[in-house]
């Protein structure tokens, strides 16, 4: 069951980059490209995920962009509300700053910082209950792929979160991002055929979990570049991209947005 009628998303994950002056320049250059070559909001959802201390600054800079560009948090606390939790930022605090979108489950959070299933479920549930839209990341390692376990691993990651997501939240607040771990920041990319095959399996799994399965956007993340964006965008179940390094270059990021906006 294809998701080809879904409005695509392109989200730039800046990770722990860049310094403030470079971030300001990056946003201004991207805004200029949007002004010169406008892409309608209805053709593609666009977001950028800066470091947490830059969220409101970037959001303010984007207010006068020629189209809507969402500001996305890279992470959220597993603890809700407010309280004595040094270093944490809750979903409610993000919402209070008009940050309505968040990444949860990125492989770097899982692998480097120990975000396990229970932690991710808590983060996801808190964000959804606060009214945020969550881009939930799933993906397999190279070892898991080589052992023929890729589909099983990815589908299990989605099934793991099903108990904390309501039918209405699946419909309105969840985006899935498939990021093969072996392709992140390595320059390696799953072939469009391999990526589409996995996205089709994810779509099938989502349709078994929820009646909203055919309407959930599934993004590809794994060394997405301007050079491969058109091919990826042509795949029926690839509904956008979670872009890493290429989003730190305004021209490259714009070309990726353009590729997906023109594909559907």
UniProtKB/Swiss-Prot annotation:
Annotated source species: Acinetobacter baumannii (strain AB307-0294)
What EC number is given for this enzyme? Answer: 5.3.1.1
GO process terms (BP)? gluconeogenesis; glyceraldehyde-3-phosphate biosynthetic process; glycerol catabolic process; glycolytic process
- Which pathway features in its UniProt record? Carbohydrate biosynthesis; gluconeogenesis; Carbohydrate degradation; glycolysis; D-glyceraldehyde 3-phosphate from glycerone phosphate: step 1/1
Outline what the protein does: Involved in the gluconeogenesis. Catalyzes stereospecifically the conversion of dihydroxyacetone phosphate (DHAP) to D-glyceraldehyde-3-phosphate (G3P).
Name the gene behind this protein.
Answer: tpiA
Protein name from the UniProt record: Triosephosphate isomerase
Recorded family membership: Belongs to the triosephosphate isomerase family.
Known catalytic reactions: D-glyceraldehyde 3-phosphate = dihydroxyacetone phosphate
A GO CC annotation recorded here is:
cytosol
């Amino acid at each position: 069951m294809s998701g080809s009628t879904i409005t695509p998303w392109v989200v730039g994950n800046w990770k722990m980059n860049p310094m403030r002056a470079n971030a300001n320049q990056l946003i201004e250059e991207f805004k200029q490209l949007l002004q010169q070559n406008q892409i309608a909001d209805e053709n593609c959802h666009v977001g950028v995920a800066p470091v947490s201390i830059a969220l409101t600054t970037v959001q303010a800079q984007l207010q006068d962009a020629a189209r809507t560009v969402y500001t996305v948090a890279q992470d959220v606390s597993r603890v809700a509300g407010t309280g004595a939790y040094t270093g944490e930022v809750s979903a409610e605090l993000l919402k209070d700053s008009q940050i309505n979108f968040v990444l949860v489950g990125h492989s770097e959070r899982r692998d480097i910082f120990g975000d396990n299933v229970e932690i991710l479920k808590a983060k996801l549930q808190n964000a959804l209950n606060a009214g945020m839209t969550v881009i939930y990341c799933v993906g397999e390692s190279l070892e898991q792929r080589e052992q023929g376990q890729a589909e099983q691993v990815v589908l299990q990651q989605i099934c793991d979160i099903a108990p904390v997501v309501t039918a209405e939240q699946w419909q309105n607040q969840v985006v899935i991002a498939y990021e093969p771990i072996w392709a992140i920041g390595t320059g390696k990319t799953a072939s469009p055929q391999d990526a589409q095959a996995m996205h089709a399996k994810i779509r099938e799994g989502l349709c078994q979990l929820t009646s909203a399965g055919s309407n959930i956007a599934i993004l590809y993340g794994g060394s997405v570049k301007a050079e491969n964006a058109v091919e990826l965008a042509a795949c029926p179940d690839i509904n956008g991209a979670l872009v890493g390094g290429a989003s730190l270059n305004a021209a490259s990021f714009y070309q990726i947005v353009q590729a997906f906006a023109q594909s559907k």
